[in-house]
């Protein structure tokens, strides 16, 4: 039988609002998509075809599973947010760690996602500062208003442009038939051979960079937003699982485009990257170039709309989640407008500070992206463990989340050691990981 969903039992007209299924799918897809499947896939494609394997396997076995369960668990617990679920299944200390973690992560997401669209738009017209201010104004509004007012109205349009962009690129790929590096030739780290300045190792770094195409903890903070709007539990699978798979597809498309861009275009990508100064160094540039070259003016505009809409739409729901999490931790009722404002102000102040630092620092975007990627994956580890505990308690087949949980634990801790702030001793890592996994298991 169908258990009544939180959308009906706890309807408050602000966050708990029943909505039609197709709308929820579109919103969930956009929330989780962000620029992950685009920028992440592009940056990840530098590693060569190994990126494909990770996107496909990670998406099916880890990512979609993770999204589905976090959404359903939330529905079973009155639309509880992530820290609350962690508290229920892993205990008090992890919950408090998670509270801080979630909010920090969400603010970082918001910040990264103010910055990247502003770059692209600023490149087209006006300065990026103007755009940053406009995007922020929109965020403040979207974070405050009831969910069906703004988010339910404009998302479906954005979602369409994102999907359109993916389809258009597929068509172009089929017309052009670019020569791609073959899988078995390039399982190593291709970028290293071609571009001496590129130093990341494939093991932890690839899995950190391609977060949203494969698995991402951020999604678990987004699923509850939609779990509060679903009309029936039967819709859980197509919506939570389906939107993740859709996202995996988008990531594959962009990875393919980027492979072509880095390894087979008339002037190889990294030379173009080196030639272009300033704004052009990071992923947004690949996007703008490809869209304008391949899709002409109209297509370019539509595609850029998609690339811009995705981060903006993830940013506002990120701030929205942050607001809800802080509020539930402080037990603040979200009905009165003033309460919503109290929670929002500090959140936005921190974000603006981050932005200022990021803009003044040439490599700022890539640094924040790496931190964001890492905290993202670490978040997914927590969630996977919580789901595993749930399944064990219910005597369900818990291996399906146990394996990804172990794997991601490995990736995250290794990354801590290997990244620039630390030392990269291979043997150390291996046995540290061994100990770590044993302790946990």
Please report, for each region that a protein language model flagged, where it lies by residue:
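Selective recognition of specific alpha-helical transmembrane segments in multi-pass small-molecule
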Residues: 102-110, 142, 159-176, 216, ...
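Hydrophobic alpha-helical segments and their helix-loop junctions in multi-pass secondary transporters
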Residues: 110-114, 118-133, 141-143, 163-193, ...
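Extracellular loop-to-transmembrane helix junctions
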Residues: 44-74, 83, 300, 430-439
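Helix-loop-helix module between adjacent transmembrane segments
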Residues: 27-32, 58-78, 82-144, 211-215, ...
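Membrane-interface loop-to-helix entry segments
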Residues: 1, 101, 117-121, 128-175, ...
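Loop-to-transmembrane helix boundary motifs in multi-pass membrane proteins
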Residues: 17, 92-99, 103, 129-133, ...
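Membrane-interface "cap" regions at the ends of multi-pass membrane proteins
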Residues: 1-38, 235
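Extracellular/periplasmic helix-exit of transmembrane alpha-helices
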Residues: 71, 173-186, 241-289, 359-363
């Amino acid at each position: 039988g169908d258990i009544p969903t939180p959308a009906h039992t706890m309807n408050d007209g602000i966050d708990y609002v029943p909505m039609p299924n197709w709308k929820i799918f579109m919103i969930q897809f956009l929330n989780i998509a962000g620029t992950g499947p685009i920028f992440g896939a592009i940056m990840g494609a530098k590693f060569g075809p190994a990126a494909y394997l990770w996107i496909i396997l990670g998406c099916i076995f880890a990512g979609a599973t993770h999204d589905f369960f976090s959404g359903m668990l939330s529905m079973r617990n009155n639309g509880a947010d992530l820290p609350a679920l962690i508290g229920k299944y892993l205990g008090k200390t992890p919950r408090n760690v998670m509270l801080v973690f979630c909010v920090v992560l969400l603010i970082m997401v918001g910040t990264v996602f103010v910055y990247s669209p502003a770059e692209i738009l600023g490149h087209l017209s006006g300065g990026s500062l103007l755009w940053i201010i406009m995007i922020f104004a929109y965020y403040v509004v979207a974070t405050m208003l009831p969910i069906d007012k703004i988010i339910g109205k404009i998302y479906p349009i954005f979602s369409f442009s994102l999907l359109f962009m993916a389809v258009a690129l597929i068509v172009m790929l089929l017309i052009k038939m670019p020569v791609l590096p073959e899988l078995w030739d390039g399982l190593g780290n291709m970028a290293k051979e071609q571009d001496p300045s590129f130093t990341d190792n494939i093991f932890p770094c690839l899995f950190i960079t391609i977060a949203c195409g494969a698995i991402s903890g951020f999604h678990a903070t987004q699923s509850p937003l939609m779990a509060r709007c679903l009309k029936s539990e039967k819709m859980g699978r197509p919506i939570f699982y389906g939107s993740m798979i859709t996202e995996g597809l988008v990531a594959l498309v962009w990875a393919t485009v980027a492979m072509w861009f880095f390894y087979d275009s008339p002037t190889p990508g990294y030379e173009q990257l080196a030639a272009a100064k300033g704004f052009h160094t990071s992923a947004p540039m690949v996007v703008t170039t490809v869209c304008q070259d391949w899709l002409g003016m109209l297509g370019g505009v539509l595609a850029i709309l998609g690339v811009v809409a995705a981060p903006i739409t993830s940013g506002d729901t990120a701030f929205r989640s942050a607001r809800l999490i802080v509020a539930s931790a402080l037990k603040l009722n979200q009905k009165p407008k003033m309460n919503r404002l109290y929670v929002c102000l500090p959140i936005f102040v921190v974000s603006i500070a981050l932005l200022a630092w990021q803009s003044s620092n040439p490599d700022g975007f890539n640094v924040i992206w790496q931190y964001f990627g890492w905290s993202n994956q670490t978040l997914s580890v927590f969630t996977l463990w919580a789901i595993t505990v749930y399944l064990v308690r219910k005597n369900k087949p818990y291996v399906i989340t146990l394996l990804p949980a172990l794997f991601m634990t490995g990736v995250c801790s290794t990354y801590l050691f290997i990244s620039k702030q630390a030392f990269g001793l291979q043997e150390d890592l291996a046995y540290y990981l061994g100990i770590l996994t044993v302790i946990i298991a």
